[in-house]
Each structure stands twice: as C-alpha cells, then as structure tokens.
Amino acid sequence: MDNCILEIRNLSHYYDNNGNKTLDNINLKIKKNEFITLLGPSGCGKTTLIKILGGFLSQKNGEIYFFSKEISKTSPNKREINTVFQNYALFPHMNVFDNISFGLRMKKTPKDIIKEKVKTSLSLIGMPKYAYRNINELSGGQKQRVAIARAMVMEPKLLLLDEPLSALDLKMRQEMQKELKKIQRQLGITFIYVTHDQEEALTMSDRIVVMNEGIILQVGTPEEIYNEPKTKFVADFIGESNIFDGTYKKELVVSLLGYEFECLDKGFEAEEAVDLVIRPEDIKLLPKGKGHLSGIITSAIFQGVHYEMTLEIQKTNWIVQSTRLTKVGEEVDIFLEPDDIHVMHKE
C-alpha cells in the first residue's frame, strides 16, 4: 500500500489464561492522512486495539510498524501517537490554555512557541477567545474540542480517538463530526477513530474497519461497506437490511420466494444457496400486478425524512423506506432492479 504509515501484523490479545482472544490475528495497513474508523459493537476489540496502538497495553502476539519501525516496546510518550479519550481526561483545576499546553510544558518548549501553538490550536477548534476560561465552565462539546486541541498541539503523526463524541447529544454530535473531518483535513494528520455508531463511521471515514468478536470482517470505503457487505453481520450492522435465503440459479440470476430476479454479482455456483441483501430504500412499490412479487402493508411509521413500512410477502416481512406513504392494509407489488440485490455466500 502506498504511503503506509502504520502496519499491524498478526496481532492477537487476550485478557484471561483460557486463550479467549479479544483480538484474533489482526492485520491492517493504514495510509498517511487517512481518516479510518474502527466500527463494531461493544466488546468487539476496537478499544483494546486502540490501547495497544497507543502503548497503554501490550499485545500477546504480533507486531506494530509505525513508519517502518517496530514500536511494540516503545513507550507511549515516544511513539508520536496521541490519544483522545471518551471521558476527555482534562485537568479540572487548569484553564483551557494550561490544559492544551500541558504536554508542551512537560517537553520544556519555549514559552513563546507554546503561546503561538495554543493560539493556533484554539483557532482551529473555533474557540479563539476561550484560552483562560475555566474547564468547568465549558459545555460537553467545548470540552471535547479542548481535548482534541490538547492532543493536536503536540503535532502527532497519528491521532487515536476512542468514542470521543458518545457523551454528546445528537445535534452536537453531528456538528462535531463535521468539525473533526474538517480539522483532520486541515492538519493532514492520520486519524484512527473508534465508534459503535454506523452513522459516524459512514459520515467521516475514508475507510471503515468492521470488527466483531476480535476479528476484522471487512475493510473498505463507506460506499463499499454499505453497498457491498461481505458477511451477513456487516450487512445487518451497517444500516437496515432485508436479508433473505435465496438460490443462485445461474450467472446473474437469483431466485427468491419463487421469483427469478436479475442481479449483478458473479462468482457463485449454479443452484448454490445464498443470502440476498436488499436495502429498504431500494425497494420500489407499485400497484398490484405491476411488479415482481405481491404483498400487503402491515405497518407504517413516519420517521421524518421517510416512512418506514413493513410489507408481508408470502409470510416474510420486508422493511421498505419511502418518502411516499402506502397505507396499512393496502396490497402492492415490489419492483427490484439488478443492482438492488446483493448476493453473498452463506456463512
């Protein structure tokens, strides 16, 4: 991979003596200036991986190369890697300036340089007039910005962010997502971001690493992860999905509920049992007799940007999302284009 700054090779970790691995043979390459997100449910190993990369925890097996140098034995303060924690970890007895400048002062940086660097950092996070504000006077979003500024002022080559927005309300979280992406682009620093929130991952990332039970399931761009999931877990975890049992009849043709649909996926055997993934927003509803399969609407909920409806077809439930309401009890047909159906091997 061109411009690779971090390479993780065959990394494993376990907390107990029974060999139950929290990380199982992790291999990953990360590029310079990349915004990469570790995404997965609680307990999947993403925070453990961040702690190992930051030097706060030692892996049981494997190697970590940072700019081609193995750093497993390197102490955290020597790694040129900084971490922003979920709880901010700010000093409540210090003001904003002193919090941000703490690391620089520990390195005995000249005062004039400290002042200039803190000023630049405050401007970058949109808080130029808050230098001497008490930490306890700040909102949650402002505290998070200060924590990020404190990490960035040290000019790390890699910034680790462990669910930094989880304590914020929805509106503030969405605003901070945009700010983080903007800051990352301006600084040109590689970010590794940890979250269980699929929206955060899809909004900010250049690439997403989907994890579960200590294993990397898929790595790709947000579009690749959403549109081309490789496993049933990924399809179900990223966005809403309809996942059905189907049969790959022949090249570019699948069978579902007795109807043969055209598809775009190749690499399957004739008559192979497969999983079919159909996103709710890709299903078109037509008058009965005008589409592929017929069903009846059994529920409809308004969700702001669209209606989410449940459609029963041959005793299977389909989730459908549309800006147009189809009333409960109405009989309709579905229509699917070839690119609306994603075919996956059975696990």
Curated annotation (Swiss-Prot):
Pfam families cross-referenced by the UniProt entry: ABC_tran, TOBE_2
Membrane topology: Peripheral membrane protein
Molecular function terms, GO-annotated: ABC-type polyamine transporter activity; ATP binding; ATP hydrolysis activity
Keyword ATP-binding among UniProt keywords: yes
InterPro entries: AAA+_ATPase, ABC_SmlMolc_Importer, ABC_transporter-like_ATP-bd, ABC_transporter-like_CS, Mo/tungstate-bd_C_term_dom, P-loop_NTPase, PotA-like, Transp-assoc_OB_typ2
Residues annotated for ATP binding in this entry: G40, P41, S42, G43, C44, G45, K46, T47
Subcellular location: Cell inner membrane
Assigned keywords, A-Z: ATP-binding, Cell inner membrane, Cell membrane, Membrane, Nucleotide-binding, Translocase, Transport
Protein name: Spermidine/putrescine import ATP-binding protein PotA
The gene coding this protein: potA
